[in-house]
A protein has these predicted regions:
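Enzymes that bind and transform nitrogen-containing heteroaromatic metabolites
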Residues: 1-148
């Protein structure tokens, strides 16, 4: 099964200048809870934006070049693997759009803000295809870093 997980702002933005436009503790805890022990798939840019491997998760990166620092996988490889177990698609924008037609579940957190000059966006979700089973809108707390 393919499952997407992402946080977006009120305008569907997920990135700015190659990084998340916020540090939102509630969403990071939610992401960890859902993906811990699982397999996460991401594009090269998302991989390079991480501080390193996230603990207790298998990391697979889609890229056109060989890498020594992480295991890589093809589009077809992701689809084949998703027949055997749940795969979490964690970004970025191109990867979300690529796998949206094959996605069975989406975990979306809406960050209560509007990011100026965002350059990466989550895919538009057709609510005739996807049923919302859980929806989170999180507001800024004292531990969070972003403009609201």
């Amino acid at each position: 099964m393919l499952t997407m997980i992402f946080a977006c702002d009120m305008n569907n933005a997920i990135g700015k200048n190659g990084d998340l436009p916020w540090r939102q503790s509630t969403d990071l805890q939610h992401f960890k809870q859902i993906t811990l022990g699982g397999t996460i798939v991401m594009g090269r840019k998302t991989w390079e934006s991480l501080p390193g491997k996230l603990p207790d998760r298998e990391h697979l990166v889609m890229t056109r070049s060989n890498r020594d620092d992480v295991e890589t996988i093809t589009y077809e490889g992701v689809l084949e693997l998703s027949k055997k177990r749940e795969i979490f698609i964690i970004g970025g924008g191109e990867i979300y759009n690529l796998f949206l037609p094959h996605t069975e579940k989406i975990h979306r957190t809406i960050i209560h803000c509007k990011v100026e000059d965002a350059d990466t966006f989550a895919p538009e979700i057709n609510l005739e295809i996807f049923k919302v089973s859980d929806s989170n809108v999180v507001k800024k707390s004292a531990r969070d870093e972003y403009e609201d």
